[in-house]
Amino acid sequence: MYEESSCFDPNSMVDNNGGFCAAETTFTVSHQFQPPLGSTTNSFDDDLKLPTMDEFSVFPSVISLPNSETQNQNISNNNHLINQMIQESNWGVSEDNSNFFMNTSHPNTTTTPIPDLLSLLHLPRCSMSLPSSDIMAGSCFTYDPLFHLNLPPQPPLIPSNDYSGYLLGIDTNTTTQRDESNVGDENNNAQFDSGIIEFSKEIRRKGRGKRKNKPFTTERERRCHLNERYEALKLLIPSPSKGDRASILQDGIDYINELRRRVSELKYLVERKRCGGRHKNNEVDDNNNNKNLDDHGNEDDDDDDENMEKKPESDVIDQCSSNNSLRCSWLQRKSKVTEVDVRIVDDEVTIKVVQKKKINCLLLVSKVLDQLQLDLHHVAGGQIGEHYSFLFNTKIYEGSTIYASAIANRVIEVVDKHYMASLPNSNY
């Protein structure tokens, strides 16, 4: 059954203690290795005459036993010891432990002698045969060849909780129970017991509070929105001067100030009208009372009535003078060819008109002032470059209700209309 070689002794000795047979450990080479005479070219294996792996096996395939009963008994004992050592180890049986195990558990078992030539190749002196399928199933995942490198633990290849236990050699029932107990618990230390961090969807991110989603706008959208605002402001201004943003803002500020002055002016006119009506009613009452007193012909009574009637009249006059503040307003309006400046101080109105010198607006403005019930007191004019400049000093008639915006709008309307009418004649 075995191939005989010059270094193998077929007469094996049987050990009565362990039941194994072992060859002699000391040997001498009987003769040198020489190639056969009949062949001139031999293979590398024939020249070296390497023994097969069966010659180095320590199991019964290369050991001759006296009988079959002792052979079966020794095999069962060896399997029992191998299973016990594998279960006690944490990360598998290393090569040194296996050699120690073979030397201690079977002291009488020795390997077959190896020639001196083969010792130079550093071949293994003994090879442990593969154990049963149960041992392989238990040790395939317990032995880690990278354990001595002290590498950090790696997450499982399959992130699912159902298969993580299968890949790590852990029962899936215990894994799912642990995951169920850790759902919603962010500070639970049980996730790090095995040295592997398990990432799952149930682990919620820590936050400092609810954050409201702010609308994100691009720079282009912001510019479009700002342009729309400027266009809306431009539509609110009655007579915008230019279309640029700075001019629109200035025109808007001027228009707001004009509205404020108009409000204050209207309040003054209303208060003045109330005081004027009260004063007229008091004068009528005074005349009627004086007539009645003359009919009675009682001088003493007349003196008393006059003293009584003077008090209400003086009270009304003082009330009107105290309630009426000094009226003051100022307004500027511009068009393509005309610029009007109106200033009102109490009942005096000063109007300044500047226009191009193609037309003469002096007569037109004078007619407009008469229509607005303004008493013209003084007019001054002159030429400044290509423009005419006129200054009108007027006074508001008593009982008239007029304000600066109405004067400016009317003057600009008339002057611009006359200027547009005179353009075709000047072209010819």
From Swiss-Prot:
Keywords carried by this UniProt record: DNA-binding, Nucleus, Transcription, Transcription regulation
Known tissue expression: Flowers.
Extent of Acidic residues compositional bias: 297-307
Repeat listed as a keyword: no
InterPro entries found in the cross-reference section: bHLH91-like (IPR045895), bHLH_dom (IPR011598), HLH_DNA-bd_sf (IPR036638), MYC1-like_bHLH (IPR045896)
Keyword Repeat: no
Main localization category: nucleus
Cell compartments where the protein resides: Nucleus
Organism superkingdom: Eukaryota
Gene Ontology cellular component terms for the protein in this record: nucleus
Domain bHLH: 210-259
A single GO BP: regulation of DNA-templated transcription
Record-linked Pfam families: HLH
Subunit structure: Homodimer.
Name of the protein this chain belongs to: Transcription factor bHLH91
Source organism (scientific name): Arabidopsis thaliana
